[in-house]
């Protein structure tokens, strides 16, 4: 007979920060009776999910990938942004053998170096400083044909903020004496992660064939035309920029294609379209034989050169639970499924022994403000069922609403998103109480608590650096001040009466009173 387990659940409310300022603060304005009651009744605190507390540069807003890696590993993990920026500052970037080989092979073949990535100072998926370093390195090594394919942000940055960056790169290429911005497209198309291949195909055609919905003579002209069409950065339609002689720029055999995004989840689909022989997401008119470089490893099954391979994280929470014969469930919607599995497990794709996974499909809508509750009801149905089954020691669940709806900049929809999650939490807490379980409620980073950019008056669609809540729904206890995301795994193990592995440098911040 199966032993009844009293689960410890970790509920991660994605994009749910705490902000003193209540103006356009969807978390504050939402009617959240369940969380209000839990906060009044149970120990709670605010913890940090940004900057140096999660291995990012000081003051850098947190994000879902970084948050889940820190939570799952129980230690501060120095992020790719920090690691690559440091390599550039130290001069090590210019000696990276993978990057050098790609550039030099292209030069030898009289071929071009194509650089693509999210041209943004956002620091979530990429950083434009890294892209600049790549352009400079290519020219320094003697490349005569250097082409930049710019994916535009407007999601981790204000909705219309791409123009200064594009102008900067046009000036940079003038200074370098060679190179140009060859194409523009919004990240909505190039960086889809939900198998919407009709979007990705537009970016693929633009880069491989030079085919765009629009043409422009310069990047600045291209972005100005997009704004005239009322397209924000994220949604800029594919725009080809021919060279000075009017020739279409396209990816050809022997060219290097260097992808400068360091975050994996939104880099995988487009990468597979370039390098997988058996790719079937859409029909490719051409498949040039290129040297493709990923800045970091996007997935174990993508066979391409990696400039900065990841270092292994051992004894993460998932691995520790496996080693102690404890059972665990990971559950979320499509949008955050990779976060509660791959990222939470420190970049490991395979589930651990005793780890079950439930994926609930996110709704197929253009943007989530059209359905702010997303699939939260179905997710909660499955989660309640899992709790009542009493077969799991630990349950990790992510509700994407605060983040995914927060990114749309739609305040009213973000309020509805928070309200939907609140009612779900009520059902979960009730189910846990029935089986003698407990839960920690927290967030990976802020977003929905700031829906307007006070300096510009534009919608605020990015994450924030605000602290995030932590509520312990369980025994009589106190939560220490000054916690951070990396303290959650050690805290959970301690609550379960388990020893914390030495690799976890976070600390247990909940002291039981009994």
From Swiss-Prot:
Residues annotated as binding substrate: 125, 155-156, 187, 193, 263-266, 336
GO cellular component: cytosol
Assigned keywords, A-Z: Glycolysis, Isomerase, Manganese, Metal-binding
Pathway named in the protein's UniProt entry: Carbohydrate degradation; glycolysis; pyruvate from D-glyceraldehyde 3-phosphate: step 3/5
Name of the top EC class for this enzyme: isomerase
UniProt cofactor note: Binds 2 manganese ions per subunit.
Binding of Mn(2+) 1, residues: 403, 407, 463
Entry binding sites for Mn(2+) 2: 14, 64, 444-445
Reaction catalysed by this enzyme: (2R)-2-phosphoglycerate = (2R)-3-phosphoglycerate
Subunit structure: Monomer.
Family as reported in the entry's similarity comment: Belongs to the BPG-independent phosphoglycerate mutase family.
Function: Catalyzes the interconversion of 2-phosphoglycerate and 3-phosphoglycerate.
PANTHER family (alphabetical): 2,3-BISPHOSPHOGLYCERATE-INDEPENDENT PHOSPHOGLYCERATE MUTASE
Protein name: 2,3-bisphosphoglycerate-independent phosphoglycerate mutase
